[in-house]
Amino acid sequence: YEILTGAANTRTFTFQVRVDTTAQPLEILDNTIEAKWDSLPGQSTALNATGNIAADGSALGLRNGTVPIPSPNTDVNDYETTASASTSVLPLTMSKTDLGPAVVNTIGAHRNFEVVIDLPEGTTNNLVVEDALSFGGVSYMLSRNASFDVSYTFEDIVSINGGALDEASFTSVATVVDGATGTVTWNIGSGITAEEDDLTQTNVNPRIIINYHARPNNDVTTNDGDNMQNSATVTYDNGEDGTTETLNDNTLAQTVVEPLLSINKAVSNASTPGVAPVAGDVLEYVITIEHDAASTSDA
């Protein structure tokens, strides 16, 4: 190219590259170009009697540059420069939801929780989900049985740790057991997603969903009036520097409620009302069960 002087005289060219599947969240994608130029179009420039100048870069020739650019470049021929541009891969996002907020939070009542993790297209390493079932000294209890099991949904995910899309491919789920309290951990590991050219379509939206149930723990520390809250933490590798990125979300606090009943029993002489009974009389008992004024839940 020949570029004349003047602000209006520029050359522009465009090229495209494809982001590789190995790209990780928050990884900075750098692209650097090196360029050189000459002081004249070539040797055939009539600046002397012969019509040709000396070899490019020589003392009697044109000044030029070299690519790749030497480091350091101490040569007089230093007509060279670089230009860089960069962009970053998107981070993960997550949300924690109580799918049944209207459920009365009494001892043993199951609440349905869901953690949704949205991943950028590419590869995510060391993906871990922790759910804190306990709060302020009281804890939900995880249910994992035929009636209330843990389930997973994998949307636009290709593999987990190179294997199938199921819990067996996770690095570890040792704490995700029936009756667990405190913190349960899904160590998912490495996930590879499906991918597409988002310039032309946006049908691929990688997502992992964990759905599970927990209930207020029936122990001596969980009682009427206690506040309970459930929170989740997601960690994963920063693709640029390898540090750990952390995401947090929690559900609304719920107050534990319990039924408190009072029972009264009365007896009367059905054979001779108002008279003390004797042998052969029929006694009638009336039992009355009602909520105490302090009761906060159906029984």
Language model features by range: what are they?
Residues 1-299:
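Exported/extracytosolic protein signature
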